[in-house]
């Protein structure tokens, strides 16, 4: 006969095993100190020799030049604040070590260590590389949302919500088409 204590221990062990084998939870930082370390050491995920622009190097182009530089979907999202349909980005399943950059200007925005599976259908991150986004309030859906734009080129990337995992509680919900992934093993 199984005792209540043995049953509870079994259920608890099973829950812990499920939690830690799920990649959406396994790599989450335990504290804000861990998040700060990810933010500080993001360059460790760059491929050797990768050169990326700095946030202090603004990129200003005319609307016509942006149309030449971006494909129509990228232009709609980055320059006209559109949103891609959920589940359409190949970056949802990107799990290799590396850095996510703005497709418009190559500014580094996130690392693979900052990414998690939010189940929303968009690439999601619990934090960002510091100083790369400017936020503004978006009223397109009547209720206000916090929208974020690349500090270098002004490109719209997505919205930040307060329903992310601990310790930040943030979900940076990004349009995948607005990002380019540079794997650590490759080059820019």
Residue ranges and their predicted role:
Residues 46, 53, 58-61, 67, ...:
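A short Gly-Trp-Pro
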Residues 18-64, 68-69:
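C-terminal segment of N-terminal export signals and the immediately downstream linker at the start
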Residues 10-12, 35, 59, 115:
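Intrinsically disordered, low-complexity regions enriched in Ser/Pro/Gly/Gln/His and often acidic
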Residues 1-15:
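N-terminal secretory signal peptides and thylakoid transit peptides that target proteins
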